[in-house]
Amino acid sequence: MTEFTTLLQQGNAWFFIPSAILLGALHGLEPGHSKTMMAAFIIAIKGTIKQAVMLGLAATISHTAVVWLIAFGGMVISKRFTAQSAEPWLQLISAVIIIGTAFWMFWRTWRGERNWLENMHGHDYEHHHHHHDHEHHQDHEHHHDQGHHHHHEHGEYQDAHARAHANDIKRRFDGREVINWQILLFGLTGGFIPCPAAITVLLICIQLKALTLGATLVVSFSIGLALTLVTVGVGAAISVQQVAKRWSGFNTLAKRAPYFSSLLIGLVGVYMGVHGFMGIMR
């Protein structure tokens, strides 16, 4: 630590900027940075590349902001402040928001399917009742038509549900400010867990009155982190678009994907919450 401090005092840390970018990118590959959760979210909503970039940048911004808040707050509140003491609380808060997001995704998908089925059943009942009144004297033909109608209804269910699902995604996630805020909130939550290494570097720079240098290193670190997170999100968005073009059965699978994605995100939130709670109880 003494040698590193000496290098900072001599101004040699400017040579560390490329290394900080690389370390940030590698740091994004470590567990605990919501890459799986972010990719699952993008896949669940069939997100665009623009939304994937937005999600990754939001996570990076919150990650950097938390580093600054902890560093400055720690210096003001107590000299004995450590990043480890704040991390459990941040994990617990993030877990609550993440689990809430998972529940919202599951409920939105379930409600959409339920409403569609209720509307279809109501329409089928009216159509069957009308058909029964006008063709009651043709018993055999009526029975045959009813069976044929059931088969046709199943085909319409698949096609119409796929169209409804696509329209719902377009309506909810295409250029709507409120939906963009939901994506930003999810990304900001994903970056809540700070990096103790980045906090340590910033604290050292502040103590040595090298605030500009510390800010530059943290920004460089964040650029590397953003490259990783944005790459993960864009990769998920592109993969969804390419698979949909090449595999006709993808739309059928995609109808159930939000359930799996919400479950996966919920498990990540539970895991994060348990670790945060255990850290607080220590």
Curated annotation (Swiss-Prot):
It comes from the Bacteria. The keyword Metal-binding does not apply. It is a multi-pass membrane protein. This is Nickel/cobalt efflux system RcnA. InterPro entries: Ni/Co_transpt_high_affinity, NiCoT_RcnA. Keywords: Cell inner membrane, Cell membrane, Cobalt, Cobalt transport, Ion transport, Membrane, Nickel, Nickel transport, Transmembrane, Transmembrane helix, Transport. Residues 127-161 are annotated as: Disordered. Residues 1-12, 78-86, 204-217, 281-282 are periplasmic. The chain crosses the membrane at residues 13-33, 57-77, 87-107, 183-203, 218-238, 260-280. Efflux system for nickel and cobalt. One of its GO terms (cellular component) is plasma membrane. Belongs to the NiCoT transporter (TC 2.A.52) family. RcnA subfamily. Its main location: membrane. Residues 34-56, 108-182, 239-259 are cytoplasmic. One of its GO terms (biological process) is response to cobalt ion. Gene3D superfamilies: Nitrogenase molybdenum iron protein domain (3.40.50.1980). Residues 135-144 have a biased composition (Basic and acidic residues). GO terms for molecular function: monoatomic cation efflux transmembrane transporter activity; nickel cation transmembrane transporter activity. It is found in: Cell inner membrane. Induction: By nickel and cobalt. Transcriptionally repressed by RcnR. Pfam families: NicO (PF03824). It comes from Shigella flexneri serotype 5b (strain 8401).
